[in-house]
Amino acid sequence: MRLQDFTSEKECSHAIKDSNVVINCIGSKVYTKKDKDFEDSNIRVPVAIAKAAKAAKNVKRFIHISAAGADPNSHSRRLRTKWLGEQEVKEIFPNVTILRPTLMMNNIHVNPTLAGKFTMQMKIFNRMNWLIEGMNGKVEPVFVNDIALAVINALKMEETIGQTYDLGGPHTYTYEEIYEQFFNVTGVKPYTNLVKFEDALEYYHYKWYQSFYRQLFRTWLFPEFMTMEAQNLIVNPKNKGFADLHIKPVSFGHKVHEYVQEINWLYNSHDSTKQQSANN
């Protein structure tokens, strides 16, 4: 079912009329441009779904996917609105189970992820990896399948009702270390170039950049995405996590080869022979 307006409680009610479980996975992208878009995705949509779930007599469980690091004082618009969305949802549906993943990685659609950024840098910048100066936060990458398993286990366990879980991978990396792993697996010598944040913003606003190059780099040069790499997206050890859901998450190191297969496919997309070899 495709809704016209996810912020409409009426449409959400129609969508869940035959459901006893509601799972909200809707969220803003890190390259969303307007404050309204963040508020719609992270606050208004969850509120509409929570109200619809509360009003539906047959809905027994509500799972809300938020984000680790959600904080009202964060410099990130995404994380600020994620926190506000959590508070609104808990007020409407107190029995909601909130899952807060860190940096999610997947090998289905790598383009809007760090693997996608790495691929673009290989194709356009001749294998050079650039980081914004002073923005090398720590992160605990988590595989998207582990988040899906967390949802399933949460639904099976009644003790998860009304609880919040921080879900992160077993190891902590800096963003530079993640890119270095990509380099090492692809057999390319690591080379990182630091760019001042002011220079990146100036480049983003160049007139010649507004057409073709804006479309090409729009994801990676949005200020929200650039500053994301300054954030520490790690779990709070005081909060409940994967262990409480009886899950041992897969480490980034074990999955990096799968990500690189997708990187190779994108990087060699002009060559059908290389496409086939990358997928073997």
Each language-model region and where it sits:
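A hydrophobic C-terminal alpha-helical subdomain
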Residues: E198-N280
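Short, amphipathic alpha-helical "lid/cap" segments that border enzyme active or binding sites
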Residues: E9, S13-S19, V47-A50, V144-I152, ...
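Residue-level signal for the nucleotide or nucleotide-sugar donor/cofactor binding architecture
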Residues: T7, S41, V139-V142, P170-Y173, ...
